[in-house]
Amino acid sequence: MPELKLVVFDCDGVMFDSKGANLHFYNQVRRHFGHPEMDEEELDYVHMHHVIDSVNFIMRHWPTELAAAHAYRQSLDYKEYIRHMTIEPDLVEFLQYITPDCRTAISTNRTTTMALLLDLFNLRRYFEMVMTAQDVANPKPHPEALLRILAHFNLRPEEGIFIGDSVVDMEHAGAAGMRLIAFKNPELAADYHVDSFMEITRLPVMTGGDRTE
């Protein structure tokens, strides 16, 4: 493989453990309309999908309330839910390790809350490009975001790698022809599997062990 020149990160489940925030945020939408809290299937869904699809899914049994549910979720202050998020402990160390040798980007199905997270956790300086669901016509798993990132840096898919944790991420990377590092998900079909960021520094993709001249 050619030299690694680009590392692209998913946000939820990779940069942050955000299930707690998603749980409280979407349960608040359900509670507001007098409905029971989400089950595990619904929690898994909202953890992987962007906010519009997520609200559509959790309110699928009450279609007459859907428009009101979207209006209500837009009125919620996401800062109230940040306290339920945990940054991966070695994320910053890994970012400092790979920059400036590798270009860095984010591809996420978050929307407006991504900028808030980057600012609150002082991460914006580490990422050269951020693609959210509102920046593309086709959110993940469609490859649009990754293809636009590659085009921005004038790189080929084999020169980059994507770090994700879900089936949506697996399909996203595969559709773009990019290698995948599965983060804390040993069941995901991927080129590599890790449980922490600094483990990545020892992978062949980082050490040059998989490089061909």
What name fits each language-model region?
Residues 1-5, 96, 111, 115-213:
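Asp-based, Mg2+/Mn2+-dependent phosphohydrolase catalytic module
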Residues 2-100:
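N-terminal helical cap/lid subdomain that shapes the substrate entry/recognition surface
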Residues 107-108:
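Conserved phosphate-coupling serine/threonine residues in phosphotransfer and NTP-handling enzymes
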